[in-house]
Amino acid sequence: MLDLCTGNGSLAVLAALAWPEVQVDAADLSTDALAVARINVEKHGLQERIKLIESDGWQNLPGRYDLILCNPPYVCRQGMEALPAEYRAEPLISLDGGLQGSADGMDFVRHLLAHALEHLNEHGVLLLEIGNEREHFERAFPTLLAYWP
């Protein structure tokens, strides 16, 4: 399985703990985030099961996966302006989904979805966190069949 945009590695660690038979690739663009993820992976003794990969999106991920988890940057422009101070302490790249110019916060998600099938095995599943941006997501991808729990 893949945890894309792993950040501090928490989803990768949780997945490895939940499914002991699974190997996890955990990828992020940020070397700082991967350094924190490495600390968390080592803290839980999961170095043999979680592989940390520096990758800008799909760039360094040639494989296919049964499950891809992703907590991408998805906050829209208006949401970024209204973020509480404690959220602004996070790196901008981990939150701002409009770094390529869109107001809806779906820049990275557009790229992610455009190439997801190239990285999913048949019957594979992609799970995305979208936070409070469901309206923007549905407007950006009106024909995509999405499940909302």
Functional labels for PLM-detected ranges:
Residues 62, 86, 138-139:
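Short Asp/Glu-rich motifs
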Residues 102-149:
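Conserved Class I SAM-dependent methyltransferase catalytic core
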Residues 3-9, 73, 98-105, 124, ...:
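Glycine-centered flexibility sites
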Residues 1-82:
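Conserved SAM/SAH cofactor-binding pocket of Class I
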Residues 51-53, 93, 147:
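Structural signal for short hydrophobic segments within the conserved structured cores
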Residues 18, 84-87, 144:
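Glycine-rich, phosphate-binding/catalytic loops in enzymes
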Residues 73-107:
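Mobile active-site "lid"/loop adjacent to the S-adenosyl-L-methionine
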